[in-house]
């Protein structure tokens, strides 16, 4: 059985973990993302700005409000998991970026980095790049 290798970053009691998702079709590449609220405040996940740079040097930006258009709220101790996949024309790429998060009692929006994740279309495991 495949056990994914998660890479993790922690910023201000927000933990973001990511790993490559195994795809049966080599024409697709996928990833899993987990956002944990380890703070004492309720948080809102307002959006994401993800970049993908392939092994040919091409860059793609995906900027969205929320996740799938939904702005999420997480109470202390709660987490959210998200999976996504994309058709690809490369053998390897790096996924990186930020999530826009605000805490309930702090009227400030922060860009929290996601861990950089190397993705492969031939289903090799991920590598830590941070």
Please annotate each region the language model reported.
Residues 1-27, 127:
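Low-complexity, acidic Ser/Thr/Pro/Gly-rich terminal tails and inter-domain linkers that flank the onset
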Residues 2-4, 86-130:
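Terminal connector regions
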Residues 27-32, 96:
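Short, solvent-exposed loop/turn segments enriched in Ser/Thr/Gly
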Residues 34-39:
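Asparagine-centered strand-capping/turn motif at beta-strand->loop junctions
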Residues 42-60, 101:
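Short acidic, flexible loop segments centered on an aromatic residue
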Residues 52, 64, 73, 112-121:
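Beta-rich interaction modules in large eukaryotic scaffold/regulatory proteins
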Residues 60-92:
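Intrinsically disordered, low-complexity Pro/Gly/Ser/Thr-rich segments with frequent PxxP/GP/PP motifs
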């Amino acid at each position: 059985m495949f056990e994914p290798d998660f890479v993790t970053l922690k910023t201000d009691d927000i933990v973001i973990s990511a790993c490559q998702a195994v795809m049966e079709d080599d024409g697709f590449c996928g990833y899993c993302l987990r956002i944990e609220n380890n703070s004492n405040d309720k948080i809102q996940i307002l959006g994401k700005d993800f970049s993908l740079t392939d092994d040919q040097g091409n860059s793609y930006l995906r900027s969205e409000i929320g996740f799938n258009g939904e702005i999420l709220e997480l109470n202390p101790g709660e987490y959210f998991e998200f999976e996504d996949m994309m058709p690809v024309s490369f053998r390897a790429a790096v996924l990186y970026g930020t999530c826009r998060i605000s805490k309930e009692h702090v009227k400030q929006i922060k860009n929290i980095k996601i861990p950089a994740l190397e993705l492969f279309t031939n289903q090799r495991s991920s590598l830590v790049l941070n």
